[in-house]
Amino acid sequence: MAVILKVDAAGKISEFSLDNIKHSKATLPNAPAPDAKDGRGGSLRVQSITDLAYVDGKVLVAGLSNEEFASTLRSIPFPFSAVDGGTGVEIFHGAHGRFETNAPVRTFVPYEIQNEPHLLAAYTCTPLVKFPLSDLKPGSKVMGTTIAELGNRNRPLDMIVYAKGGTDYILMNNSSRGVMKMSTKDIHKYEGIKEKTDITGLPYETIAELKGVQQLDRLDDNNALILVQDESGAMDLKTIALP
């Protein structure tokens, strides 16, 4: 059973009880079947939700469905009411040299590009793709714009956006490619990758001093919270200045 833990100012860890907590619930109508498997025998159902975020009165949910376009983005009004089947999404994966509809978004962040709300979404083997939020209509199918290929044999874990020195940056931690920092200054100029390629598109730098980062989130305008795993497997929760 999943639990939520809290840490107080003294560093004491305790369980956050959900007893008698008011809540609402949304049930996905077209999640993969309990016994559905991927090509490697892994459960597809556990990928029904791979990431989520609250934006302007809606909960945005990425994951898989049981539809032909299995990769799905959902925009669910909050407080929850009826949940539709979501939007099937397709991308061109430059590292694989093909169009894909079955790979789920691993992590995403809402971001405005030239005053238009978008999702910036990262996938396994690390294509970075943008989707206009206005395209996420129930039952429709949309093609994302791949604006970067950031390296294969890797899974993006978390992604945040922050401002520093008058410029917005994306910070993303990964399973095997460290923590990447990308400027969004010219993000609107990338029209999309359409052929097989290696690392290309929106450039990044690797933050060398940040190693073993398993989870990443913004703490405030100047700091981030990271969960770091060392070589022994021990986990440390740390606060860092945004780079």
Label each residue range with its predicted role.
Residues M1-P243:
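Sequence/structural signature of beta-propeller domains
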